[in-house]
Amino acid sequence: MSKDIYIEIKDRNTFLQYLKENTGVMLFKFKASWCKPCKMIHDDVDKYFEMTNDNVTCFDIDIDEYSDVYKFLKSRKMVNGVPSILGYLKPNDTFVPDFSFSGTDKRQLKVFFDKINLVSNTNL
């Protein structure tokens, strides 16, 4: 059975509400259809998303379709381009991520997901 991956967040208020209601770990990948680096890591990220624990909720957000959250986070220097993945532990009342990844380095991508799997295995 494949893991549900959510592809939309309407606005920053919805994003902040998700963080407040988080019961485990939330991952938000920001991408764009025109972004070549995003395409370079796409398959790897999908594979890692599938391998995350049940208490990890994954979002795969196209910044051209759902730009409000991306612009909000960029204005606060939480992301500075795509591809970027932000990880949040429960509960989080701010927009500051607990973990982040940016770029195309596949070794660092694996390290990022290893950390996510490690913390999601603990009693959050």
For each feature predicted by the language model, list its residue ranges:
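N-terminal leader/targeting and pre-domain segments
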Residues: 1-26, 107-124
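Thiol-based oxidoreductase modules, predominantly thioredoxin-like and allied folds used
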Residues: 6-11, 30, 42-49, 53-70
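Residue-level detector of flexible, active-site-proximal loop/helix-junction positions
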Residues: 13, 34, 63-65, 92, ...
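Local sequence-structure signature of Cys/Sec-based thiol-disulfide redox active-site neighborhoods
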Residues: 16-50
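Hydrophobic beta-strand anchors of alpha/beta hydrolase catalytic cores
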Residues: 26-28, 58, 85
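Eukaryotic short linear interaction motifs
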Residues: 36-37, 66-69, 94, 107-110
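Mid-chain, well-packed structural core segment of small domains
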Residues: 68-81
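Non-catalytic, surface beta->alpha helical segment in thiol-disulfide oxidoreductase systems
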Residues: 80-81, 86-124
